[in-house]
C-alpha cells in the first residue's frame, strides 16, 4: 500500500501495511519500505525504495524512519531519482553509511494504488551522491543507468569532494569540475573505478613473522560476513586457513552437507591433492590445507584466491573468493620470505 506523510507512519504503527511510501506528491522523494515476511526470508533485511526528485527535506524524512527503526541498519536501499537537492543527497548518503546500508538502483514494487512503475531506473546528480554513501554499492544491471556529475561552485564543489573522499570514492570518477556534463557509467566502469564494490570491500593485509615462520593474513568485509585467508609459511611447508563467517547455524548446515572442500588459486586447484579439512568454529566455516613449498611460485602473480565447499549433490558450491591485486605488495613480501625459508631448509637438509 502506498500512503503519504502521517498516514504512512500510522499504517506502520498499526501493522496495516508493511510496504509504504512517504512523499508521493511527485515533487518529493518517495519512500517504499518492504519488510514483509517473504522479503525478510529471502533478502534477510528490509528492501527500501527511494524514488522521485530528492527535495531539500528528503534526508529529514528518511532520517526519521531510520530513527524509529522503520528503516533499520543494514537495509538494502534501492534508488531511482533524476536528482535534486545536492545537500540532501549528501545527507542521505551519510545516513546510509552510518547505518551500514547497501545501495542499488531499482524501481519500487507495484501496488494496488500504484500499479505501474517503469522497469528501468536511473540515478543521477544528487542521487549519485546519495548512492556513494552505501557501505556496499551494487553496480546497475539491465537497462538501469547511473550518471555521475561534478559540482560547480567553489563551496559546493569542496563539500562534494570532501564527502566523496569520506565515502572512499575518488572524486575524479564524477568528472572534471570544469564541466557540468553528466558522465553515464556502465557497471564495468563503476566496478573498475571503485564506485561499485558489489558487496565486497577492499581486502586488507597484515604480514609478519609468526611461530618460527612468516604469516600473511588477508581480511575482507563482505555483504554476507567477514572473509579471511591466513597463509603461514613453515620450514616444512605452507598452510592455508580460511575463515568464512556466515553465522553459526548456517555454518553447521554447510559443513554437514559438504562432500568436498578445497582452495583455488587463479581458478585452479591450489595443490595436486586439493582437499581441505573443514570444521565450524563459532559463526565460521574454517578450511585448512597444507601445500608443498615447491608450489610457492604461483603466489607472487596470483590474482585470485578462493575457498569452496560443495554440497552433497556437487552441483552447488559455497564459499568466497578474494582479489589479490589490492594486497599485491604484501603477497610478494610473504612469497619472498617463504622462498628464502625454502632455500635455507634445502641447504640444511643437504
Where is each model-derived feature located?
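Proline/Glycine/Serine-rich low-complexity intrinsically disordered segments
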Residues: 66, 79, 100, 108, ...
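C-terminal segment of classical bacterial N-terminal signal peptides
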Residues: 2-11
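Catalytic and GAP-homology cores of small GTPase regulators
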Residues: 26
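Cleft-lining beta-strand/loop regions that shape enzyme active-site pockets
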Residues: 30-142
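Charged, glycine-interspersed solvent-exposed loop segments at helix/strand-loop junctions
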Residues: 75-76, 147-209
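Short secondary-structure transition/capping segments
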Residues: 115-121, 151-154, 210-214
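Stable alpha-helical elements in mature extracytoplasmic
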Residues: 58-62, 88-92, 123-127, 134-135, ...
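A generic "folded-domain core" signal
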Residues: 14-17, 21-22, 30, 46, ...
